[in-house]
Amino acid sequence: IGMVVECKDGYLMGPDGCKRGCLTRPARYCPNECSRLKGKDGYCYLWLACYCYNMPESAPVWERATNRCGKGK
């Protein structure tokens, strides 16, 4: 009997609704943050934002369709 686990990839999102930046962060910042949220791995995309792989469906990731960065709460 198999079990299907839904996962998603995407940019980590901060409490302000913006992508989580990584330009001035230590090298392992993004992989550590992705792991903390139960993602498999991650990296600093173009030294601008953390991108994570295999995140649980419940993890908040930035999406263009629901972008609220810079738009208040």
Swiss-Prot record:
Q: Where in the cell is it found?
A: Secreted
Q: Decide whether keyword Disulfide bond is in the record.
A: yes
- The cysteines joined by S-S bonds are C18-C69, C22-C44, C30-C50, C34-C52
- List the Gene Ontology MF annotations in alphabetical order: sodium channel inhibitor activity; toxin activity
* Membership in a protein family: Belongs to the long (4 C-C) scorpion toxin superfamily. Sodium channel inhibitor family. Beta subfamily.
Q: What does this protein do?
A: Beta toxins bind voltage-independently at site-4 of sodium channels (Nav) and shift the voltage of activation toward more negative potentials thereby affecting sodium channel activation and promoting spontaneous and repetitive firing.
Q: Where is the LCN-type CS-alpha/beta domain?
A: 8-70
Swiss-Prot/TrEMBL keywords? Amidation, Disulfide bond, Ion channel impairing toxin, Neurotoxin, Secreted, Signal, Toxin, Voltage-gated sodium channel impairing toxin
Q: Which residues form a coiled coil?
A: none
Q: What is this protein called?
A: Toxin Td10
Instruction: State where it is primarily located.
Output: secreted
What residue range is the signal peptide? Answer: 1-7
Instruction: Spell out the PROSITE patterns in the cross-references.
Output: LCN_CSAB (PS51863)
| Other remarks on this protein | Negative results: does not affect the cardiac Nav1.5/SCN5A, the peripheral nerve channel Nav1.7/SCN9A, and the voltage-gated potassium channel Kv1.5/KCNA5.
Q: Which InterPro entries match?
A: LCN-type_CS_alpha_beta_dom, Scorpion_toxin-like_sf, Scorpion_toxinL, Scorpion_toxinL/defensin
Q: Which SUPFAM superfamilies does the record associate with it?
A: Scorpion toxin-like
Keyword DNA repair belongs to the record: no
